[in-house]
Amino acid sequence: RQDVHKDATFYHGSIADYRFMTEVLRKEKVDGVIHFAAYSLVGESMTNPYKYYDNNMSGTNVLLKAMVDCGVNNIVFSSTAATYGEAQNIPILETDPTNPTNVYGETKLAMERMINWYHKAHGANYVSLRYFNVAGAHPSGVIGEKHDPETHLIPIILQVASGRREAINVFGDDYDTADGTCIRDYIHVCD
């Protein structure tokens, strides 16, 4: 709650709770949703896939139904580059084939498809953003991610550099770049 702006109203509830979702959407007269509600640990998704199917996919289904029933026609979806799996081409283009290699990526791709069908059935506007590694924060430190345990690449690298973690494994050394590692585009949190 300390991360919520003082002028914002904080609601604690589940994306999978239809009644809760419709109450908030109606009370706040929401006209668009930014959908970040998903479990996102690749390793955990492989050992506990049902948790990911239930929250990520079923929860999104409930959200979309609530949006339809409340007349909310705009959604920005936080997806993942994990939907591509092992890319056939570098750099990866949005038009490249998707082939997730883990449950997390599979659920995110399914969520994208659900949102696309929501668009086709109800004329809703949407965009799915396929991030690679989320890193950084607003200069104030107010906007950004905090994980415990840390699971994201850049913070793990910083933990190694500061001696709080012994090592990091780097996978992929045969890309057509100066050091053999892949190159990624990025968007700044302030953009």
Model-found features: residue ranges?
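NAD(P)-dependent short-chain dehydrogenase/reductase
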Residues: 116-191
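N-terminal Rossmann-like NAD(P)+-binding domain of SDR-like oxidoreductases, especially those catalyzing
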Residues: 1-134
